[in-house]
Amino acid sequence: MDKILEILKDFGIVELRPPQKKALERGLLDKNKNFLISIPTASGKTLIGEMALINHLLDGNKNPTNKKGIFIVPLKALASEKYEEFKSKYERYGLRIALSIGDYDEDEDLSKYHLIITTAEKLDSLWRHKIDWINDVSVVVVDEIHLINDETRGGTLEILLTKLKEFNVQIIGLSATIGNPDELAEWLNAELIVDDWRPVELKKGIYKNEAIEFINGEIREIKAVDNNDIYNLVVDCVKEGGCCLVFCNTKRNAVNEAKKLNLKKFLTEEEKIRLKEIAEEILSILEPPTEMCKTLAECILNGSAFHHAGLTYQHRKIVEDAFRKRLIKVICCTPTLCLNANTEILQESGFRKITELNKDEKVFALCGKEIKPVDGWKVHKTPQHEYNIVVKTVNGLEITTTPNHIFLVKENGSLKEKEAKDLKVGDYVATVDRIRVKEKDIDLSNGDLYFIGYFIGDGYTGVIEKNTLKATPDLAFNPKYPPNFDDSELHKKYFLKCRISKGVAHYIYSKKLRKIFNKLNMLTKDNKNIDAFCNLPLDKLAYLIAGLFDSDGYIYLNRKNIEFYSISEKLVEQLQFVLLRFGIHSSIRKKKTKTMVSPTNGKEYKCKDIYVLTIRDFMSIKRFYENIPLRHEEKRRKLEEIIKNKEIGQIPSEFVALRFTPIAKIWCDCGFSVDLTMFKPRTKRQRELNKKRVKLLFELLDGKKLITNYKEYYSKRKNPYFDFIVREKINGNNYYSLNEKGRVLMSLLNKHIKDKENLEEMYNFLVNLEKCPICGKPIHKEMRYSWKKECYDGDIYWDRIKEIKKIKVNDKYAYDIELPDDGSNSHYIVANGFIVHNSAGLNLPCRRAIVKDLTRFTNKGMRYIPIMEIQQCIGRAGRPGLDPYGEGIIVAKNDRDYLRAYQALTQKPEPIYSKLSNQAVLRTQLLGLIATGEIRDEYDLEWFIRNTFYAHQYGNLREVAKNINEVIRFLEENEFIIDFMPTELGKRVSELYIDPLSAKFIIDGLEEMENEEEIYYLYLISKTLEMMPNLRVYNSEELNLIDEMDSLGIKSFEIEDLEAFKTAKMLYDWINEVPEDEILKRYKIEPGILRYKVENAVWIMHALKEIAKLIGKSSDIPEKLEIRLEYGAKEDIIELLSIKYIGRVRARKLYNAGIRSIEDIINNPSKVASIIGEKIAKKILDELGVKFGQQKLSF
């Protein structure tokens, strides 16, 4: 328990939620006890699973054990999100985290990982490759375990759980509220945790007759501004500053409802301008824009939008972004779901203005609690606000943003999002403490890296003029402190001699050393850089930095700081960047230099400006001391002296000081207190002012004093002397006198201090007080600090805001950065040292969730939407830290709807049932079990089925036994198995993870094929179950389709065949580069559906290719089609498409310009660069092993 709580504290979690406490109390940490957690959304289910994982994977010392854990999620996107979240949390303890969501026909080696994040289908496919590491798994967490009820996917999850039950593993099931949790828990032999606690109050109600009737009896009248109920509900919420989600039963209804919700009259002029920009962006995604794009753009202009699977990823992302910014006020959906121009964003080469970012570099973003480089970002311009907010922190950071830009704030131990206009002085905002990069080692020793660092700082490598190297490499140093290069092979190999000139020593090196530096891409003078070393492992990078500071760095005892000087701005910026990897903070300033006159010829020489990097806060100096192995004896001595400073030694362990004046206040329980900053000011001006104040206090010992101009004692900074005086206004004059505390303090100082102007002496006297002068009790002493340990949180430092102000702006635009919505990041970027929202986040906070439809069309006609699904929809209302409450509203059109709505809001959700009797599930799963040897005869089969959830629920296996016998007969008749032994075909189909019936369709089609036509192969894959549902065929299309099919030798013309052939025609257009908009219009589909069909087609074409090899029907056409389907391109550019960084657009450009093969690219690098740009060309050539512009490093 202590280990768990200690690790949770590392994440800032100091108190568990009620369901989490209940799980621990019931024995969650018993490794042999399964659990089923059935609680509402956002109640903390995931953390319960994490506690179980921690318990298995980390020992008492927080080190990895030899066990593995699996975290199963329902969707790939969620898997990516959890992967990044868990990496950021647990890699610090040495846990290796893996994400496994790739191709099903892929045998990944996951044996070296401790925690594997995956989907049920991917784990099932891995199992079929007979993974050995499964024996090391001791805990499995299943998120959304209620999906065992899903018609198509539930059977796979049930089979997996049945297998896992036979292993010695702890199973933790995380579920939404379901109707029969006890039944599922009993099958799992699990402790059941049921709780209805929510972090934000959810008000549930029914809308009917222009009023919301809440379940708690409250009634809210809704003003009818239109005859549309949804419009009235939305307007009522929007007027109060809220946003709405409207859940519809179909994509078409979502679109139609969004079109009706015209909210223009409730939009400000600024919002209208910004929505117009967003609408234009929507229209720019596809060229030319589709009808759906145009409809969505029109809705956005009105403040509404629709959101469903038919939209492309880019469209959905833009809608989510605008809703998150509260520009779009309402989204109608199906039940799925700005910065100043001078702002500097942290990239891999350092901080750059947002308007000048390098497109080829990643930006640093928050990923969980770690700050890492993220690719796939974009910059967007938005109209500037009439005013901006300037935020300054205690630690000296400053940023200017639009009023609605979102900051991450810590309040009372919990995280909140706040817009800039809502921030206040004293708030703790997230700033960067350290950054993390993907490390890349170089074959250089620590000694060589130290040598290189020293040479970059104080070395001269000569110059190249007209391709000729002039001068020799030279390293200057103080002979009193010669550099220690004993462990440097580079020094030993290329050293020539040592000479001393005018008291300065010089090491002279061979010109060959310059060539080595050139290969490392290090330039000379003001262009020096350390590009090649920025991503070194920290233990090696430390030696390079040590060399830099031992040569051009300075340790100042009097200032108590560290500085580095260089005329190379780039070098100093890169140094600032790499220091952040150690959590070492620094600032950069430019120091102007004067013109020098030569004493020999009298000529004036303009000196280059010097860039100074300064490390001044104690934590950074301490980290520098602990991580950077300086070899310069004098510098090391000074650094040690700073660290061992007597005053620093007085700081208690629970605090870390930022400044070096340790005692800032003395106080007693009786109420006596003295702010000592009055006696130890930080500036000369403050010192003079405070002398006047203290002199006044001594004068007041004699009694009341008339002050004619008290402003000379006043400062905009703290005025601690006000604690000791009373000011009265009599007849327009200001009279001062000491209060009781003032009389005690000044009497004490008057008695013990001789020099009444010596503030230092007064300070030392008060610091050494042990007992209170009023009551005699012990004196407490408080440090002058601003950094506390609790302010450090992963890679975040919570800095306190010291100033906020509004400023008018003249800029036309503000800027946003969009980060990829792939689970790789937390949608916060590093800007001016702050961690601010990238304004394109994932969450869709809403005040009111509205369920418009209670029914939807199924294969059995119109049916009520399950209560569990409705409760999940309304559970979206009310986000912690964002809404004071949430409202889940169901619209009742009649009395029947009212009754159903009441049931949905008050009754338990429906029970979940096993879907194992589904023949499609049984075909795939039984073949998999036989192929892996888990079932070898009828007895194994019966024993396995009796352990399933199906058997637990129904007891009688007669119905499922009938289906099982039919499936076994099918597998035998089609030669997938023989006497419960898999054939080669059966094994391969199991590994390919397709339905055996789909494999039969493919085999039959290949054997009946008369002509090898591309369209025929596409027809074969379109007939598979994995491609269902196919495109709808209209009566007017049937005859033409039959004629085309007949010409290919296809003799079956059932409606399913016609639909498969129409789908094949769509895929054929795709691979022949027909414009996307034309495909969408021709086949009456949406962009998202096209993407889905293409992804599945790539998978099934791969399966067809593999099956064709086994049955002797191999051909190169399927292999080419697999690539062409992936890229949507013609055959002539396939070779080019096989190269990383080349998509169909670049491939077509290269091909049309005569670059048609890999050999052409290698032989014509300049031409390639002129066609697609030098940066991309360099990446492509590097991928092909050809260096562009530089040679490989070799000694």
Curated annotation (Swiss-Prot):
Domain Helicase ATP-binding: from-to ranges: 26-196
Biological-process GO terms, alphabetical: DNA repair; intein-mediated protein splicing; intron homing
Domain DOD-type homing endonuclease: 451-584
Keywords attached to this entry: ATP-binding, Autocatalytic cleavage, DNA damage, DNA repair, DNA-binding, Endonuclease, Helicase, Hydrolase, Intron homing, Isomerase, Nuclease, Nucleotide-binding, Protein splicing
Post-translational modification: This protein undergoes a protein self splicing that involves a post-translational excision of the intervening region (intein) followed by peptide ligation.
Record carries keyword Nucleotide-binding: yes
One Gene Ontology MF term: 3'-5' DNA helicase activity
EC number: 5.6.2.4, 3.1.-.-
Residue positions of motif DEAH box: 143-146
Subunit structure: Monomer.
Function: DNA-dependent ATPase and 3'-5' DNA helicase that may be involved in repair of stalled replication forks.
Protein name: ATP-dependent DNA helicase Hel308
Native organism: Methanocaldococcus jannaschii (strain ATCC 43067 / DSM 2661 / JAL-1 / JCM 10045 / NBRC 100440)
